[in-house]
Amino acid sequence: MIGKFIVFEGVEGGGKTTQIELLQDWLLETGESRQILPKSIDLDLEVVITREPGGTKLGKALRELLLSPDVLAEKIQETSELLLYAADRAQHIEALIKPCLERGTIVLCDRFIDSTIAYQGYGRGLDVELIKQLNYIATGGLKSDLTFWLDIDVEIGLARAKSRGNFDRMEQANIEFHRRVQQGYQELAKNNSLIVRIDANLTREKVQQQIQAIIMQKLVEWKYI
């Protein structure tokens, strides 16, 4: 595939949505001024933002089930939750991500397979190896070209999330759950060189500067410039 798949990960309140939007704007501006297109692609630069769950029509329905506290009158069991995320991902890959990458698009995705390992594996306590196998089935082995882990103090992140308004079902989990999720991201980053830690405790401008510096290096490595 000739496009690039860039994922943003992290606990609640890390600013993923803001940073993705800022990066999209910067990439498009940089593309216009520096002609950052591989020589094999004779197209205008396209940068698409998506998210998990919720990147497709099916995904939006699953997102409502997974994250809205009042949709279901019963508790979603941990294994059911895991399988719903996998269903969202399988649809997302085939309906949106693969077609975008095949036509040379840069895809910026808010959460991917590492979220499932961190939240359902470390957070919920489900078998991490089983989750990895399920992720492989859902993705067909597709991995990100680069993952940014927006690392923020858990308490600060939850306070930021709370300031936005109503908590979703994940944000309502207790602090110990979120600390376990953070531990999951720490372990993932230790063992995967494609995961780049970004200090998300800083201002959004400084966070974006860190991201752009890494992306500029990658654009050279990927022969975009």
Curated annotation (Swiss-Prot):
It comes from the Bacteria. ATP binds at G10, V11, E12, G13, G14, G15, K16, T17. GO terms for cellular component: cytosol. It catalyses: dTMP + ATP = dTDP + ADP. PROSITE patterns: THYMIDYLATE_KINASE. Phosphorylation of dTMP to form dTDP in both de novo and salvage pathways of dTTP synthesis. This is Thymidylate kinase. The lineage of its organism: Bacteria, Bacillati, Cyanobacteriota, Cyanophyceae, Oscillatoriophycideae.
